[in-house]
Amino acid sequence: MGYSVIVDSDKCIGCGECVDVCPVEVYELQNGKAVPVNEEECLGCESCIEVCPQNAIVE
């Protein structure tokens, strides 16, 4: 879809909120951090940005 997802691994605490809220399963927890594994599926809805308590996700 043309959206770029960046997770600041220094800020990410691995809470999984982005994993739970994403409607197209862009994220996966790996080694205790959120990783965008299906970035090409991103709809740009920004739900992940809104729920991240650490502001670790940038679109």
From Swiss-Prot:
[4Fe-4S] cluster 2 binds at C22, C42, C45, C48. [4Fe-4S] cluster 1 binds at C12, C15, C18, C52. Residues 3-32, 33-59 form the 4Fe-4S ferredoxin-type domain. Disulfide bonds: none annotated. The keyword Electron transport applies. Transmembrane segments: none annotated. Its cofactor is [4Fe-4S] cluster. Binds 2 [4Fe-4S] clusters. GO terms for cellular component: periplasmic space. Ferredoxins are iron-sulfur proteins that transfer electrons in a wide variety of metabolic reactions. PANTHER family: ADENYLYLSULFATE REDUCTASE, BETA SUBUNIT (PTHR43687), L-ASPARTATE SEMIALDEHYDE SULFURTRANSFERASE IRON-SULFUR SUBUNIT (PTHR43687:SF6). Homodimer. This is Ferredoxin-2.
